[in-house]
Amino acid sequence: MDRNNKYQDFTNLDVWKLSHELRMKVGIICKFLPDEEKYNVVNQIRRSSSSVGANIAEGHGRFHYQENIQFCRQARGSLDETRDHLIYIKDLKYIKKEGSVEHLIELCEKIKKKLNGYIAYLQKCKKD
């Protein structure tokens, strides 16, 4: 978010693109979770996975580095919550397709690295 450049939409951010991918894939696996989890882990993981990209987008729209950083930190918390739910789903073997949940856990780790890099970038911009 360089002040000298033209405005970039949040949908152009690589970290948002990855978080959107996570949200969509979580929505797909939720269809395969047992009914008894409908009001427990399904609601929780849908909410937390949606919150990642939503917080990145909201922070981006604030135009102040410190606010953007704070929303990215909230996104990071939601990302870890999503990862925790995925570990639970994996450990209970709710999803039978080999590697599908593991792939989402790896995607969470990839997003976290990107998000940490984006936060570091925003902190640097704030100092300049």
Report residues per predicted region.
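Amphipathic alpha-helical assembly/interaction segments
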Residues: 1-128
